Structures are given as C-alpha cells and as structure tokens.
UniProtKB/Swiss-Prot annotation:
GO molecular function term, any single one: structural constituent of ribosome
PROSITE patterns linked: RIBOSOMAL_S5, S5_DSRBD
Subunit relationships: Part of the 30S ribosomal subunit. Contacts proteins S4 and S8.
Record-given protein name: Small ribosomal subunit protein uS5
GO annotations of cellular component type: small ribosomal subunit
Domain S5 DRBM: 45-108
Chain segments annotated as coiled-coil in the UniProt record: none
One GO process term, biological-process aspect: translation
Known function: With S4 and S12 plays an important role in translational accuracy. Located at the back of the 30S subunit body where it stabilizes the conformation of the head with respect to the body.
Length: 212
C-alpha cells in the first residue's frame, strides 16, 4: 500500500519521491539566496564601462578574436577601482573587468564633496590635473576622467587633460592623481602644524558644516 514500508526494509516510491522533492527545494532555496546576495553586492556599486575593444590573435588556424573592457567601479562615497577584463564575449569581458576593479578599490580623501588639494597624475603619455571646486560647481571633466570621478562620489571638481587622449592612459592618470591625495591631518602632522594652518578657510567652513 502507498506510504507503507515494504517487508524487505525499503520504502515505497511515493515516500522516496517526497524526500527527493524536499531536497531539491532546499538546494534551490540555497542557490537562490546565494544569487540574491551576489546581486545585492553588485547593485550597491556604480559601474561604468569606459571602452570596449576587439582584439585579435594570429594562430596556426587563422585569427582568434576577443574583447577587452575597461571598467570603473565605485560606491559613490569615496571608494573606487579600475579593472581591465578580456574574454571571447563582451558581457564576460565586462564582468571580469568589474571583478578586477573591486579588487583594486582604494579610498579617495574628500571634504564636502570635493578633493582636498590640487594634484596632477601621470600614466604613460596621459597627464590629468585636478583642482578642488566650490559647492555647486559640478564635475567639470570630460572623456575618460568623468566616470572615475563620478564613481568615486566626487561632486565638485575641475579637471584638465594635458597629455594623451587614449582612454586607458587618461583613466590611469586620473587614478594616479586620486591616489596622491592626502587628508589635511596628514599634511599637518608631517609639517608639525595645526590642521587650521594647512587647510584653506573655505574648506574649513565646509568641513565644519559637514560635521567632519
């Protein structure tokens, strides 16, 4: 009869089917939770694809094509990273670039939405100059510099590209400039002065209003 044990100690088919169904549902629930966790981590970051290129490799049988993607990822609150992905398909290249960008995260010092002091970054032939700006100025930047600044959460800044227009060089020059930024406390400690002596009055007022 259904639901009863057989004399040889085995269980009837309907019980085995029920147990299998419960196990499958449990595995599916766990997989769904893992998938939601990955989606939540991905959604909390800002992603910008700067450039996608098709590259080829000459092999014995002909040419093999693949794609490269330069991706910027940031949380919009001071954390930003740059990644370069390569794959046979565009979505896979973008995903690899985003994963590498998360591994390369670094913190950008800011005061009231702008950078702490003027700075110039260089990478190969790319040269990018950044200057602090008053509230309401916005991000005055173009080309490949803008997505880096926006992903970092910088709201007011002046920038100028002085070298190569190559997107990869410009992005890495911008990153080099941002990595050179230091907080006023670090400058004061290095010079043996107070924070008020090394920080412009406008930034001190903005910092006081920010509650930093």
């Amino acid at each position: 009869m259904p639901g009863r044990e057989r004399r040889d100690g085995g269980r009837s088919a309907d019980k085995n089917d029920n147990n299998k169904g419960r196990n499958d549902r449990g595995r599916n629930d766990r997989n769904n939770r893992r998938g939601r966790g990955r989606d939540d981590d991905r959604n909390q970051y800002i992603e910008r694809v700067v450039t996608i290129n098709r590259v080829s490799k000459v092999v014995k049988g002909g040419r093999r094509f693949s794609f490269t993607a330069l991706v910027i990822v940031g949380d919009g609150q001071g954390m930003v990273g740059v990644g370069y992905g390569k794959a046979k398909e565009v979505p896979a290249a973008i995903q690899k670039g985003a994963e590498e960008a998360r591994k390369n995260f670094f913190r950008v010092p800011m005061i009231a939405g702008t950078i702490t002091h003027p700075v110039q970054g260089e990478a190969a032939a790319g040269i990018v100059m950044l200057r602090p700006a008053a509230p309401g100025t916005g991000v005055i930047a173009g080309g490949a510099t803008r997505p880096v600044l926006e992903c970092a959460g910088i709201q007011d800044v002046l920038s100028k590209s002085l070298g190569s227009d190559n997107a990869i060089n410009v992005v890495h020059a911008t990153v080099d400039a941002l990595k050179q930024l230091v907080r006023p406390e670090e400058v004061a400690a290095r010079r043996g002065k107070s924070v008020e002596e090394v920080t412009p009055t406008r930034m001190l007022r903005a910092r006081a209003g920010q509650g930093a």
